[in-house]
Each structure stands twice: as structure tokens, then as C-alpha cells.
Amino acid sequence: IRITINNESLFNSGEAILLPSFQPILEKLALSLEGTKGKILITGHTDDSPISTSQYPSNWHLSLARATQVANSMAKNTGLMGRLWPEGKGSAEPLVSNTNSDKALNRRIEIDLLF
């Protein structure tokens, strides 16, 4: 089972701090997943627009930081710690071409339930 969340709902551009407006939704999702078994893979994806900051030297670093933030948020006040596995893919697995009109679809978090 895969849940895909558009990054615009979760993060500001170039950042890995969760937007406060999405926090309650993520908490409800985490609580609902407590009743499941198996690992939960959280994968961060970006578009191919280059980023190079001291905090995020590449899209891979940004995507991993975002996946880690989602995992940390989901682990808070739940029994999911130890089942959550964050990973970053950067721009390596786009859903669509990275044209200006489509690239936003490539900026996402995927949550996979691995039974």
C-alpha cells in the first residue's frame, strides 16, 4: 500500500521543516498505522531543479531530510518507532517529466506499508 503526499502540502520550497497545517493530518495517519504490521518506508523525492546550500548540498540531502522529518513526526506519540525507514531519492525517480508545468508532481513523499 502506498500513500503519496505532494510536498507543497508538507514543506516550503527548499526546506525540510513540516508545515504546521499538515501536522494534525500526519498525526492521524500515524495513529491509524499503529494497527498495522511490518515496516513503513518513507521516501522523499524532489524535482531536478538544483539546490546547493550549506544545509542541503544536493536534492538527495533535501529529500532525505524531508523523509526523516516525516518519520520523526510519525514516531512522536505513537508506537511506530523502529518500524519507520526514511530514505531519500532526490530527483532519481520522477513521476513525470521535469518541465516547468509538471515538475511539482515530482516533489513528494511516499509512505509504503511493507507487509
Each predicted region: which residue ranges?
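P-loop NTPase nucleotide-binding module
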Residues: 23
